[in-house]
UniProtKB/Swiss-Prot annotation:
Interacts with gE (via C-terminus); this interaction is necessary for the recruitment of VP22 to the Golgi and its packaging into virions. Interacts with gM (via C-terminus). Interacts with VP16; this interaction allows the formation of a tripartite complex composed of VP16, VP22 and UL41/VHS. Interacts with the capsid-binding protein UL16. Interacts with host CGAS. This is Tegument protein VP22. Highly phosphorylated in the host cell. Packaging is selective for underphosphorylated forms. A motif (Nuclear export signal) lies at residues 232-244.
Length: 300
C-alpha cells in the first residue's frame, strides 16, 4: 500500500499530457504547477475513477473472447437461465421431459468448467425418489375397482327361492315351494322362515293373477275390436278388470304349472271358450296338492 501511494503521489514523474487526465483528473487552470493540491482535494473521486476505467479498458468485450464465454452466473442471460430452472422444477415434481444431468465426460466450456452448474444436480436426484414413490400408491388405486365391484355385487339382488327377479323368464323358470326349515308342523317360525314363506306366497298369487288378467284383457279386446284411436279411448274408459285368485291349497301347484306362460294361456283360453272358469277347469284336471302339515324334504 505504501509503494502504491508513493507512486500515485508523485505526479511529477509522469509526463504531462499523456496519462495525467486518466490517473489524476484535470489540472486546475488557476494553479497548473500544483498537481499535489489537486490530488489531495479530489482524492476520493480520482481514486475510484482510474481503477474502473483501467479495468474497463483491460476487459474489452470486443477484444477478449474469454470474457464473453464466461460461465459466471452474473454474465448469463435470462434466456439461458430459464430452461435450466424449468428443468430442475420438472425434475423435482416427477418424471417428465426434463433434461438429464450432463455426463461427466461431456463438453465443457472455456476454463475447464461445465456450463451446467453442479449445484442443480442434487435437485434432479432429489426428484427421483418422488418418481419412484408414486407407483407405491398403485395398490391403493388398484383396490378401487375391486371395491366398486364389491359394491355392485352388494347392490345386486340376492337370488331367492321366490323367483322375484328383474327378467320375467328367469322368474317363471323357478319352482315355488314353502320353507322346509321347521322341524314339525306346530314348530314356531323364525323371522327368516316367515319372510321366505311370505315372498313365496306373493310370487304364486302374482303369477296366477297375471295370467288371469292377461286372459281377461284378451277377451275384452276381442269383444270390442277397436280400429281407431277414438274406439281405443272409448274402450279404455269402459274397461274394468277384476282378478280373483281362488286356488286355496293348490296355489303353488297352479303357479308352478304356469312356468311356461304360453302353454298356460292356451289351456286357460280353451277352458274359457268352453264357458268354464279358467281356475276351476285347471283345478279339476290336476291331483290334490300336498298338505302343509305333511313332513317336507330337508332344507337344501
Amino acid at each position: 500500500m505504501t509503494s502504491r501511494r508513493s507512486v500515485k503521489s508523485c505526479p511529477r514523474e509522469a509526463p504531462r499530457g499523456t496519462h495525467e487526465e486518466l490517473y489524476y483528473g484535470p489540472v486546475s487552470p488557476a494553479d497548473p504547477e500544483s498537481p499535489r493540491d489537486d490530488f489531495r482535494r479530489g482524492a476520493g473521486p480520482m481514486r475510484a475513477r482510474p481503477r474502473g476505467e483501467v479495468r474497463f479498458l483491460h476487459y474489452d468485450e470486443a477484444g477478449y473472447a474469454l470474457y464473453r464465454d464466461s460461465s459466471s452466473d452474473d454474465d448469463e442471460s435470462r434466456d439461458t437461465a430459464r430452461p435450466r430452472r424449468s428443468a430442475s422444477v420438472a425434475g423435482s415434481h416427477g418424471p417428465g421431459p426434463a433434461r438429464a444431468p450432463p455426463p461427466p465426460g461431456g463438453p465443457v466450456g472455456a476454463g475447464g468448467r461445465s456450463h451446467a452448474p453442479p449445484a442443480r444436480t442434487p435437485k434432479m436426484t432429489r426428484g427421483a425418489p418422488k418418481a419412484s414413490a408414486t407407483p407405491a400408491t398403485d395398490p391403493a388405486r388398484g383396490r378401487r375397482p375391486a371395491q366398486a365391484d364389491s359394491a355392485v355385487l352388494l347392490d345386486a339382488p340376492a337370488p331367492t327361492a321366490s323367483g322375484r327377479t328383474k327378467t320375467p323368464a328367469q322368474g317363471l323358470a323357478k319352482k315355488l315351494h314353502f320353507s322346509t326349515a321347521p322341524p314339525s308342523p306346530t314348530a314356531p317360525w323364525t323371522p327368516r322362515v316367515a319372510g321366505f314363506n311370505k315372498r313365496v306366497f306373493c310370487a304364486a298369487v302374482g303369477r296366477l293373477a297375471a295370467t288371469h288378467a292377461r286372459l281377461a284383457a284378451v277377451q275384452l279386446w276381442d269383444m270390442s275390436r277397436p280400429h281407431t284411436d277414438e274406439d281405443l279411448n272409448e274402450l279404455l274408459d269402459l274397461t274394468t278388470i277384476r282378478v280373483t285368485v281362488c286356488e286355496g291349497k293348490n296355489l303353488l301347484q297352479r303357479a308352478n304349472e304356469l312356468v311356461n306362460p304360453d302353454a298356460a294361456q292356451d289351456v286357460d283360453a280353451t277352458a274359457a271358450a268352453r264357458g268354464r272358469p279358467a281356475g276351476r277347469a285347471a283345478a279339476t284336471a290336476r291331483a290334490p296338492a300336498r298338505s302343509a302339515s305333511r313332513p317336507r324334504r330337508p332344507l337344501e
